[in-house]
Amino acid sequence: MKQELVPALMDIDARIAVKDGHVEKKPHGHGDVHALLHQHGLPAKWAKEGREWLLLFQDTNPLPFRSLCAILGVSVSRGFAMNSVAVPRLPGEAVGGICQLSYGADVNPDQVYQQQEQFIRKGASGDDLTINVEYNQLDPLLKDTPAGGDVADASGFSPYPGNINVLVFHVGTMAQRLATTGGIVPEFVNPKWADAEKSKFKSPTRLECMMQDFPRLCTKARCGKTWMWKVHALAVNPACHSVWL
């Protein structure tokens, strides 16, 4: 399997960037793993073979296998379609935070853990998501809520633990959701702006997608997180539901 590049965008009107007479192309993001798995029929094949669970991880983190047995056990006992390993995260830290998003619900950091446990028992619905929110979006999202921003709780950490892209999927559910959606994960753009008005790009940007956005392909299926320590160490230079272990 090989990921294809996508055309780069030169401005807010999404005009295609051209360099030296050729369309400029960039990677589409690791969310393409879902489309590639579906295109090659692998989740459906694995489900027919009786395989139940799939682990996805990034090779910049050498420690994910420390968590594998525990996160598999949690995934089975909770009936999760996707389970994310999460780590303690400081407020404002440049790591995505895993949150329970409930439309129309206020966010109260003093009640977040209780809400997450209630959500586990209730199960996910089409209006609720346990999902990663990127750090540059998390604080602005929370500023308009009673939380007032991404602030520490009594532990000194953010109530929204860090996503490290160690993800366990239930193969049967994954195959069904990818068959329904074609494995197409919702896309976004994250341009570097050249002006305060955010009207010009510093350089061409790209449409991209992320593998941890799989919960956005799910309705009714339960997606959660397992909070763990000492399962994350970068091998490169760095530039909701809750179960404690």
Segments the model singles out, each with a brief description of its role:
Residues W46-Q58, L63-S67, L72-L245:
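Catalytic core of tubulin tyrosine ligase-like
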Residues M1-R51:
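Conserved N-terminal catalytic core of the sugar/cofactor nucleotidyltransferase
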